[in-house]
Design a protein with these regions (language model features):
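HIT superfamily nucleotide-processing domains
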Residues: 1-144
C-alpha cells in the first residue's frame, strides 16, 4: 500500500508533520505520541501504510517489537526512570484503533501514574470452552 495524504502517520513518515523521532530504520519509525498517556509514551510504526496487524509480515512485526523493546529499555535507563512498560496494540475498531495505520504503543509506567487497564480478568472459563476456542484458533491457523 502507498502512503495516504489523510493518514497522520504517513505524513509523519514523509516529513510533512513534525514528530519527536526516537528510532528510524528503512522500514520502521518510532516517535513520541503527541497525546501521551505517560511521559515517554512512544509509537512504533511501519513506514509503509499498512492499516491492520494482518498486513504486517512476520519480519516487520518482529522489527516493530524489537524497536519497542529497545525503547522500553532506554526509558528505564533514561532520566525518565520509568518503573515498568506496557506494550499495547489496538487492531480494529472493536479494539479501539483510532489511526488505521499499524502502530504499537510503548507506555512507560511510573508508580502512581494513574493509568489503568480495566478488564474482568477473573472470568474463570470452563476448560471445555477453552478447548473449543483453542480448536477454532488452531483450525484458522492451519488455513493461513
Amino acid at each position: 500500500m502507498t502512503a495516504t495524504d489523510d493518514c497522520v502517520f504517513c505524513r509523519i513518515v514523509n516529513g510533512t508533520l513534525p514528530a519527536s523521532r526516537l528510532v528510524e530504520t528503512d522500514t520502521a519509525l518510532a516517535f513520541l505520541d503527541i497525546d501521551p498517556v505517560t511521559p515517554g509514551h512512544a509509537l512504533v510504526i511501519p513506514k509503509e501504510h499498512l492499516p491492520d496487524l494482518a498486513d504486517l509480515t512476520d519480519d516487520l512485526a518482529g522489527e516493530l517489537l524489537a524497536i519497542a523493546r529497545r525503547i522500553a529499555d532506554a526509558l528505564r535507563r533514561s532520566d525518565l526512570r520509568c518503573e515498568g512498560v506496557n506494550l499495547f496494540y489496538a487492531d480494529g475498531e472493536a479494539a479501539f484503533q483510532e489511526v488505521f495505520h499499524a502502530h504499537l504503543h510503548v507506555f512507560p509506567r511510573y508508580d502512581g501514574d494513574g493509568f489503568t487497564i480495566n478488564a474482568n480478568w477473573g472470568t474463570d472459563p470452563d476448560r471445555a470452552d477453552l478447548d473449543d476456542i483453542a480448536t477454532m484458533v488452531v483450525d484458522a491457523l492451519g488455513s493461513e
